[in-house]
Amino acid sequence: MEAVPEKKKKVATVPGTLKKKVPAGPKTLKKKVPAVPETLKKKRRNFAELKVKRLRKKFALKTLRKARRKLIYEKAKHYHKEYRQMYRTEIRMARMARKAGNFYVPAEPKLAFVIRIRGINGVSPKVRKVLQLLRLRQIFNGTFVKLNKASINMLRIVEPYIAWGYPNLKSVNELIYKRGYGKINKKRIALTDNSLIARSLGKFGIICMEDLIHEIYTVGKRFKEANNFLWPFKLSSPRGGMKKKTTHFVEGGDAGNREDQINRLIRRMN
């Protein structure tokens, strides 16, 4: 037999009485977790700002480099014109003097290039000191010297130990471009970039290699700073060797003043 389900008993309510409502507990609001965390948003924002700053800086540097390249080109062009004008003036003056039946005497040279050709074993302290002042501490070291009364007297003191003369534009150009090293933070640094020169000599208006060559060759107002910036040139032993180091050049040796013939020696040693 099937079981008969029991019927629920109805509870009779007395009229006038109300059912008591059970108070509901406090509602808990669920926090929505953002799809992207705030820290990640902040990182992205900072990265975007940094990227914009980098791009602006890169663009500014590119513009500056472009302007500097243009300035260097204009300077090189101007210097080339100036050198040609100097050369043509010399030729014209010599022709005019020859035409008038006179002799043209060129201006006294302002620049000398000095090369040490001998050691200093057994020499006097005075000679040793002068060689140190000329920054000729090793054999076949070379430096540019501004010619005046004091420097000529110094060269006479150490004349048996040096070969010197008056370099032309080609020699100055080749020496600085091929053997040029700068003194940067008391270190010998190869001049491979104009920015190295601009960093050290920019305050004197020398920002590129052409400025440096022009200042040295013309013995300008900032010759001292430009020459001190250049590390003494380390030249090679001359091709074909030396004739006689202990004898003066006018007697068939190598020492002393050889005037314009120093350019031939520079070609052999550079």
UniProtKB/Swiss-Prot annotation:
Component of the large ribosomal subunit. Homodimer. Interacts with DHX33. SUPFAM superfamilies: Ribosomal protein L30p/L7e (SSF55129). The keyword GTP-binding does not apply. Keywords: Acetylation, Cytoplasm, Phosphoprotein, Repeat, Ribonucleoprotein, Ribosomal protein, RNA-binding. The modification N-acetylmethionine is found at M1. Sequence repeats lie at residues 7-18, 19-29, 30-40, 41-52, 53-64, 65-76. Component of the large ribosomal subunit. The ribosome is a large ribonucleoprotein complex responsible for the synthesis of proteins in the cell. Binds to G-rich structures in 28S rRNA and in mRNAs. Plays a regulatory role in the translation apparatus; inhibits cell-free translation of mRNAs. Belongs to the universal ribosomal protein uL30 family. InterPro entries: Ribo_uL30_ferredoxin-like_sf (IPR036919), Ribosomal_uL30 (IPR039699), Ribosomal_uL30_CS (IPR018038), Ribosomal_uL30_euk (IPR005998), Ribosomal_uL30_euk_arc (IPR035808), Ribosomal_uL30_ferredoxin-like (IPR016082), Ribosomal_uL30_N_euk (IPR012988). It holds the Pfam family Ribosomal_L30_N. The modification N6-acetyllysine is found at K146. The lineage of its organism: Eukaryota, Metazoa, Chordata, Craniata, Vertebrata. This is Large ribosomal subunit protein uL30. GO terms for biological process: cytoplasmic translation; maturation of LSU-rRNA from tricistronic rRNA transcript (SSU-rRNA, 5.8S rRNA, LSU-rRNA); translation; translation at postsynapse; translation at presynapse. The gene is Rpl7. The modification Phosphotyrosine is found at Y161. It comes from Mus musculus. Residues 7-76 are annotated as: 6 X 12 AA tandem repeats. The modification N6-succinyllysine is found at K149. The modification Phosphothreonine is found at T39. It comes from the Eukaryota. The keyword Isomerase does not apply. It is found in: Cytoplasm.
